[in-house]
């Protein structure tokens, strides 16, 4: 086993114990998980190289410190073990299991189950669907917006969520975004033959929004919306940003959202979600001229 392979195995163990890679990033003081996703990709790419340096000492010390591991833990081989589901549940926030399965070979359809002490979610999507949706989340206005993604993206979306709505809608909105992002990433597979980029302008009366997507494997959200009020019905508009952060970080897409005008908050939100659906439809579509090629001079969009 190379040094890099050893570091990778131990790094993945830390992520599993934390509940997920984004939660490990938060534990270690990162604002977003992008740096740790890039570290994972580099370790995977260099795993078989005996001369690769693995994780640099300063980052190794940071990971060990924030996860309560002794100094040098990442440099040592440990007996493989699985985090018990009951132990994960006892933390109150840990992600207990993520199950992702394609329904058939070559079919861009997937079901993801994500269960925590805050939410229990099942998301099924078909990127080559007809725009149907079946939504049971307990948050009516969020369902109305996700229905726009399905209808305008021509993506079939089925979401069932039982969340801690007695507290508020925050965990439900964020975790649905996370799980939907995981489903998009899994359904896309190696991304060969897709257009990769998508964009859309959508108006609704006085409101106009622009959404641009790059399915690059590089998560990043630029979010420019100044809603004219803080609540639409009883839904807190701040949660839209949490929803899109979840999608971005777990689908590994770059997403720019700009509401260019609008006075009615409902119209502002609806133009954003319709534009997102249409931009996503464009980005995930197969380009017949690509003939199964990866739309990148790098040769991959998953490493």
From Swiss-Prot:
Record-level GO BP terms: L-histidine biosynthetic process
SUPFAM superfamilies registered for this protein in UniProt: Ribosomal protein S5 domain 2-like
GO molecular function: imidazoleglycerol-phosphate dehydratase activity
Main location: cytoplasm
Pathway: Amino-acid biosynthesis; L-histidine biosynthesis; L-histidine from 5-phospho-alpha-D-ribose 1-diphosphate: step 6/9
Cellular localisation: Cytoplasm
UniProt keyword list: Amino-acid biosynthesis, Cytoplasm, Histidine biosynthesis, Lyase
Keyword Transmembrane: no
Family the entry assigns: Belongs to the imidazoleglycerol-phosphate dehydratase family.
Protein name, entry field: Imidazoleglycerol-phosphate dehydratase
Encoding gene per record: hisB
